[in-house]
Swiss-Prot record:
Residues 522-849 form a coiled coil. It holds the Pfam family eIF3a_PCI_TPR-like. This is Eukaryotic translation initiation factor 3 subunit A. The keyword rRNA processing does not apply. One of its GO terms (cellular component) is eukaryotic 48S preinitiation complex. Residues 798-809, 856-878, 893-918 have a biased composition (Low complexity). It is found in: Cytoplasm. One of its GO terms (molecular function) is translation initiation factor activity. It comes from Cryptococcus neoformans var. neoformans serotype D (strain JEC21 / ATCC MYA-565). The gene is TIF32. RNA-binding component of the eukaryotic translation initiation factor 3 (eIF-3) complex, which is involved in protein synthesis of a specialized repertoire of mRNAs and, together with other initiation factors, stimulates binding of mRNA and methionyl-tRNAi to the 40S ribosome. The eIF-3 complex specifically targets and initiates translation of a subset of mRNAs involved in cell proliferation.
């Protein structure tokens, strides 16, 4: 069977009826009844105007019953249902929750005050009160505390805890939503006020660290989501800055300086790179910085304290909220900065919005230029003594009446100013003396004894150690001689120049006539040169300012462009979201129409069912007065009617039980006087029983003491026998111990002998093993040497064989060389015969040409008449060159050609006219030109040699 759905307004009415009974059980039942409404799946479909009173009543019950977890879950469900349609309802519910929690805390405080005021002078313990485990534990832990603390822990502490949880829950509900951003800041302000009023330092740190900073980081991280926090909006940024400044003020009032410094960083992170911040807000920012950077906090914080005062005065003057004492604080804070270098802390410099690390000289010069005429006369005189004309011998006398006349607002700077005066005094003495006594320094500061600057020997030594450690002075203290020796420091780059200027000014002051006056023209030239340098510097500075202004304008235009782009993107997203929402609303309207049609159909069917049930008598209600009828609801009404009858029966039984309870109470009321009489009687009987028990215990103690004394006397008579027996037993035990020691010594000697034999045997075996290994190693070495000798012998035989083969090869080469020489001789003879034949043919041709009667053979068809061949010497190398080439080839190298282009063979030209027909001529024409070696030419010439038969 599905669970019965109860309409929210009916659940609210039922809860109010239960609360009207005024019992704890009825409160719990009313709370459970409302919890079922939040757990229903139809909760989000219920109108907000119906849900708001239900949520309000649910919050009231959560506050009364201390159900913070249920309150948080219920608020989350209500937020998810109402954040898109009715944000005002969420704000009203959150304010109501916090108001109820604060009212509960106020009621607890008033109740505690009444109980504390009603406490008697002597605390009375009521034994009739029931003992609770919580009260027992509380009494164990706060046993030493008074009744006031115990009452406050019992009443106020739970209310404070629940109030703090309500702030945390509401901040968690309203975070990261631009629609709930106003209520978020308001709740944060109320939480700060709560922490400040009740001194909840741990809760304040938890609020700042785990809630506000985390929510701001998430807002920047998820800025692209719908309804995200937009820090570019001036109003939103202003509200966030107001919250952070209130956080800073609360941290300062609670003296949580570390949390105040983190709050300063939060404010700086919000205002960094943004314009349009109010001057009053910035003045408040720097004023809180002055409280954090205390002047007496040391050198590293005093300089930032003075810089914060200077920045505060600038913005306060711009906002028109300058304090009368502000100028004096600016100048005194600058003068109170200790001498020496300042450690660079970029984090603090960034918090002050300064371009570089501030220094004492710059702060003093700026403060003197802007505020010297505004400060009181005594502060102005202190400035002149410390910075303009410091005289170590008279400074203390002049400063003594001035520091006593300072107003209370300037008193925090006196300890730091004292250190500055002592530093100036020691630096002035170091320039004049190499060593000075401590008594002399105390005499110089003696006029300050009746002032806050009183200095004794211990404080002076402490200051010397601190100044030397900081590097303000370089000195050593001789405690025996009670003197201070100043250590000379190496001169800096401008030391001689500074000394020369000082000497020049001193001489001019003592004897002006010794220095020649500067001529008017030189003075004008120097002035013109200085003016030109100043003009160039001003021009350079103007260019830098113009460039910076251009860069700032470019950055501003870039930021505006980015902002416009982001705005266009947000508008686009918003338009898309509106279109999507309109589409969803149209879809939802269609769904509602269909749902309404279905509902009407079900209602008609339910009316028919209700009529049938009424006719059967199972339903005893007016059907016409019931709305939203359906079959399941009718069955539920029937079940509810049965439950109602059962409840009426139980109510009658409860009334009877209540009557019996009243009778029991009346009986107990009547027997209460009798109980008091019985208590007095029982108390008297207990007193008598107590006295009797004490008397019996006293008699028993006396009897026990008497028996103990008798026992002591009896045992005392046996003491001598006991001592004798004891000595005999001890001597016997000594003899047994001696015998045992002797036996143990004998066994140890035997064990030593056995161990010695084992060691000797092991050493002998080790020695034999080493000898065996040495013999084996020597045998292996001998075998290796034999193998090496055998291998060397084989290599020698192989080398001899190679040498024999080389000799045989050399002999064969010599034989080939001899054969080649014989071939060359034969070729040379053949060449000579060819040349002789060639000359003879040429001579015959010449004779035939000159005589004209020589015989010529008839020319055959297809042949070419022979032509004269050139001389042999005109083509190719000589026979000597060909011989050298032949020798080179026989030596193993390739034949080297003496000419790059081939030369036709002389034998071919000589054999052309002596050919024996066309076949012979054609065969000779088909052969390629022989451009190879010489002996082939010779062979070709020999084959083509002309015959001498048939000559002239």
């Amino acid at each position: 069977m599905p669970p019965i759905y109860v309409k929210p307004e009916n659940a609210l009415k039922r809860s109010e009826e239960l609360l009207a009974l005024g019992t704890p059980q009825s409160q719990q039942q009313a709370f459970d009844n409302l919890v079922e409404v939040f757990q229903s799946k139809r909760f989000k479909q219920t109108p907000i105007n119906v849900l708001e009173p239900i949520v309000t009543k649910f919050i009231d019950l959560c506050v009364v019953l201390s159900r913070k977890a249920h309150a948080k879950s219920g608020l989350l469900v209500f937020k998810s249902a109402a954040q898109t349609t009715n944000v005002g309802a969420i704000e009203r519910v959150l304010n109501h929750f916090i108001a109820k929690a604060e009212a509960r805390l106020a009621a607890a405080v008033e109740q505690a005050k009444k109980e504390v005021a009603a406490l008697p002078d002597v605390p009375v313990v009521d034994d009739d009160l029931p003992l609770q485990p919580a009260s027992l534990m509380l009494d164990c832990f706060v046993d030493s505390a008074g009744d006031r603390e115990r009452i406050e822990r019992r009443l106020i502490a739970p209310a404070q805890k629940f109030c703090w949880d309500s702030y945390d829950i509401c901040l968690d509900i309203a975070k990261s939503n631009d629609r709930l951003e106003v209520i978020y800041q308001s709740i944060a302000h109320r939480a700060f006020h709560f922490c400040k009023i009740h001194q909840r330092k741990a809760d304040f740190r938890r609020l700042c660290e785990q809630r506000l900073r985390k929510d701001l980081a998430n807002a920047a991280k998820y800025s692209h989501q719908q309804h995200a926090i937009n820090l570019s909006d001036p109003e939103t940024l202003g509200r966030f800055l107001d919250t952070r400044f209130l956080q800073l003020e609360t941290a300062v009032e609670l003296e949580l300086w570390q949390e105040a410094f983190r709050s300063i960083e939060d404010v700086h992170g919000l205002i960094a790179g943004r314009k349009g911040t109010k001057p009053s807000m910035m003045a408040n920012y720097y004023e809180k910085l002055t409280q954090i950077f205390k002047a007496e906090g040391g050198k590293q914080t005093a300089v930032f304290h003075a810089a914060a005062w200077a920045r505060y005065f600038q913005h306060a003057e711009r906002a028109g909220i300058v304090n009368d004492k502000a100028s004096g604080c600016v100048l005194l804070s600058a003068l109170a900065v200790p001498l020496g270098e300042v450690e660079v802390k970029q984090r603090l410099v960034a918090l002050l919005n300064l371009p570089k690390t501030p220094t004492r000289e710059a702060l003093v010069q700026d403060a003197a230029a802007k505020h010297l005429k505004r400060v009181p006369a005594d502060i102005r005189q202190i400035y002149k003594i410390l910075e303009v004309d410091f005289e170590p011998t008279t400074a203390s006398k002049v400063l003594a009446p001035l520091i006593t006349s300072l107003s209370p607002e300037y008193q925090p700077y006196l300890p730091a100013l004292r250190d500055v005066v002592l530093s100036r005094l020691l630096q002035a003495l170091a320039q004049v003396y190499d060593s000075v006594t401590l008594s002399h320094i105390l005499d110089l500061v003696k006029p300050l004894d009746n002032t806050p600057w009183a200095t004794d020997m211990s404080s002076l030594e402490k200051f010397l150690v601190t100044a030397c450690r900081r590097g303000d002075i370089r000195a050593s203290v001789d405690h025996v001689a009670q003197t201070i020796t100043f250590v000379s420091t190496p001169p800096d780059a401008n030391g001689l120049q500074t000394l020369a200027v000082c000497l020049y000014n001193t001489i001019q002051y003592l004897n002006p006539s010794r220095l020649a006056p500067v001529s008017r023209s030189d003075a004008f030239a120097a002035a013109i040169a200085q003016a030109e340098e100043e003009r160039k510097a001003a021009s350079h500075k103007r260019q830098i300012v113009i460039r910076r202004r251009e860069l700032l304008e470019e950055a501003k235009l870039r930021r505006e462009k980015e902002a416009s782009t982001a705005l266009a993107e947000r508008l686009k997203i918003k338009a898309e979201e509106d279109a999507r929402r309109a589409k969803e609303e149209a879809k939802q309207a269609e769904i509602d129409r269909v749902r309404k049609q279905i509902h009407e159909t079900k209602q008609a069917e339910a009316k028919q069912l209700a009529a049938s049930l009424a006719a059967q008598g199972a339903l005893k209600v007016d059907i016409s007065s019931i709305e939203d009828l359906d079959s399941s609801k009718l069955v539920a009404m029937q079940v509810e009617q049965l439950a109602k009858e059962k409840k009426e029966l139980s109510e009658r039984l409860r009334i009877v039980g209540k009557r019996v309870d009243h009778l029991e109470r009346a009986m107990r009321k009547e027997e209460r006087p009798l109980l008091a009489q019985d208590y007095e009687r029982q108390k008297a009987e207990d007193r008598a029983a107590h006295d009797r028990a004490n008397q019996i215990a006293r008699e028993q103690a006396i009897e026990q003491q008497r028996a103990a004394r008798e026992l002591k006397q009896r045992l005392g008579r046996m003491l001598e026998d006991y001592e004798a027996v004891k000595e005999r037993i001890e001597s016997q035990m000594q003899e047994e111990l001696k015998a045992a020691k002797e036996e143990a010594r004998r066994k140890i000697e035997e064990e030593k002998a056995q161990l010695r034999e084992k060691v000797i045997k092991r050493k002998r075996e080790e020695k034999e093993r080493k000898l065996k290994e040495a013999r084996e190693a020597e045998e292996r070495k001998r075998k290796e040497e034999e193998e090496a000798a055998q291998k060397a012998e084989e290599e020698a035989r192989a080398a001899a064989a190679l040498e024999a083969e080389a000799a045989a090869a050399e002999q064969r080469r010599a034989e080939r060389e001899a054969q080649r020489q014989s071939d060359l001789e034969r070729i040379r003879a053949q060449q000579e015969r060819e040349e002789e034949a060639l000359r003879r043919r040429q001579a015959e041709k010449a004779a035939a040409t000159s005589g004209g009667s020589a015989y010529r053979p008839p020319a055959r068809a297809g042949t070419t008449p022979p032509t004269a061949s050139p001389a042999p010497s005109s083509g190719g190398p000589s026979w000597l060159a060909r011989r050298k080439a032949m020798e080179a080839q026989s030596a193993g190298g390739a034949p080297v050609a003496s000419s790059p282009k081939p030369v036709p063979s002389n034998s071919a030209a000589a054999s052309a006219p002596a050919s024996n027909g066309p076949e012979s001529i054609a065969g000779e024409a088909e052969k390629p030109a022989l451009t190879g070696s010489v002996w082939r030419r010779g062979m070709g010439a020999r084959r083509g040699m002309p015959s001498t038969r048939g000559g002239a």
